[in-house]
Amino acid sequence: MINKEPFQKIIDNLKESGNYRVFNDIVREKGEFPVAIWYGPYAIKNIVNWCSNDYLGMGQHSYVIDSMKTALETAGAGAGGTRNISGTTHYHNALERELALLHKKESALLFTSAYNANQTTLETMGKIIPDLLFISDEENHSSIIQGLRHSKCRKEIFKHNDVQDLESILMSNPGPKCVVFESVYSMDGDIAPVKEIIEVSKKYNAITYIDEVHAVGLYGETGAGICERDKVEVDIINGTLAKAYGVQGGYITGKREFIDAIRSMASAFIFTTSLSPVICAGALTSIKYVKDHPELREKIQERARKTKEEIERQGIEVLKNDSHIVPVIIGDPIKCKAVSDELLYKEGIYVQPINWPTVKRGTERLRFTPTPFHTDAHIFDMVVKLKSALKRCGKKK
């Protein structure tokens, strides 16, 4: 019989420290985004969603939904197997071709999530090149950290976005190397000096691996990300279909031989049921639509700037960055949860508290993600209510 005590102790400690996670029960109604329905403990009411990663609202777009309906009626609900055993459909192949085309790469490979894509790819690279040294940005995502850990390769950590520190590590480590970093960091919203990192990595003949999860669909002429925007060539790109493209799944792109080796050697890819063809159909439609509609990228940046300006106008400090992400640092987990609850329960504003372990202790925050569909009225209303909630919870700014 399982002893419940150690598990309950963990939960009690999380609750006491303010780091216990509560999953809010919401329903997003098609055509109403960013308004949603919240099934709260005391009532059911409309809320305005300020923390969705469906950055462009493509998860609600009629073209995406219609293509998924068609695929559902044509191919059924599930893939029916792993990619090797009956789970590769025309929809999977078409989507992988489109992703390779988007990033101007030779090949692409789908995964069930971008987390899975990162962890599995990095782990498998370690199997293929056992003496590979991974050089990782100190702010990299959990999926990257886990991938490096499971690779069993040596790793060095360079200071966040510090090209000089990166070069010193590259210089002192001969042999095969891979520099792993992100383009847009999801919690602070800062953008890496991608061009400089790639240049110094190439100087020392290192493989470059970039996570563009919070950039694909949002930056670059066709939405291929920061690499496209900055006109730079990277060896391996990790991306997602679940944020700007509004559906589900992750992927990697790169040289044909590299992708084929990962496909052939990655256990977590080989032994997993593949994405539903319905998901693939929706993602393919979304990518093509977003590629052809740069006004969506322009609008989300304009909405982010507007949101930052209005928050600062009220005397509230916003963490400075050049991206679409709007972080407001609270600096205390209990207060962060309290402000979030005030906004949700009293004001109908939904922004999830971001606490440890997602961010470092002492940097707890509310992370706002304005979309092209947040109006001026939404922004003004949220900012006034945020200021009041901060005051009621004992934080003036």
Predicted features and spans:
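Conserved PLP-binding catalytic core of the aspartate aminotransferase-like
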Residues: 298-305, 312-348, 363, 370-372
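PLP-dependent enzyme catalytic core of the Aspartate aminotransferase-like
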Residues: 58, 62, 66-70, 74, ...
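Active-site phosphate-binding strand-loop segment of PLP-dependent enzymes
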Residues: 54, 156-210
